[in-house]
Amino acid sequence: MYWKNGKLIPQEFLEDPDPMLVPMVYEVFRVYRHKPLFLSEHLERMFRSIDLLGFDKPYSLDQIQDHLFELLDTEPDRIGNIKIRLSWWPDPILEIGYIPHRYPTEKEQTEGVNVATFHAVRNTPNIKLWNAALRARTNQALKDLGVFEVLLVNENGQITEGGRTNHFYVKNSVLYTAPVSSVLPGITRQKVIDAAGILNLRVIEKYLLESKVGSVDEMFTSGTSAGVQPIAMVNGILLPEDKSITIFVQHVYNQMVEKEIGPNNYGW
C-alpha cells in the first residue's frame, strides 16, 4: 500500500523515476510504534531542497503529514522505512510508501562493521536529490566488497560522507566530521552533534584523508537506518577496539529516539 496524489494504492511502492528525465527530491525516515522519527526535521529539509532547486511546493508541510498518516493508519503496527518523494513530470507527483530496509544487528551495533572507501562525490551534496547512477555504483560496491557501507572520497583524497550516511571519527577525545558544505546535512548527523554537546565533546568539521584512516581512535557512521553505527574496519585496516566515545554518543542518540517516539498506543 502506498499513497499517490490523493489516493491509497493497494500495491507496493513502485521504482523511482529516471532522474535524467524526472527531477525528484525525497526523504527517508523510520517509523516506530506508528510514529515517524524526526519527521519535522525531514520535511523541513525536503522543503529546503525544493527551495534550492527553485521548484514550486504543491503541498504544505501539514498536508504532507496528513497524507503520511493516512498511509500509516492502514498498517498501524508496521515498522520500517518510509520514503516521501516529490517529482515534477510535467506536473508535481507526491508519493509516500514503505521501502525495503536493512537495520544493523545487535552485534554490529556493539562490535562495529566493516566499511570501504569509494571514489565518488555528489554533485549537489546539500540537496537530497535522487541520483540513480551513484546509488547503483555504491550498491554494486557494497556487493563486490562485502561491506556494510562505503565512504565517498573526493578528488583530493578526502572522505566526505557515506553512500547512505554521514561519518564521524574520533582523535584524542575530539569528534570530527566532514564540513557540512560538502555533505548532505543528515538529520542523524545533527542529532549526533547535539549528543556531543550533551556529553561535552568538542566537535570539529575537518576532512579525514583516505590515507589516514588507520590513524583514528574511533569511527562511526550516522544515518536513518543504522542510527549511530560503530566501525570496526576500514579498507581492511582494523581500528582500535575501544569504542567508548562512540558508545556514549550512541546511547545518548538512542535516548533521543525514545524521547521522540514515546510510548505506543498501548502505553509501551
What are these regions (language model features)?
Residues 77-85, 95:
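Ordered, amphipathic secondary-structure segments that act as subunit-interaction surfaces
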Residues 1-70, 89-268:
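Helix-start/capping segments and mature chain N-termini
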Residues 73-80, 201:
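Short secondary-structure junctions
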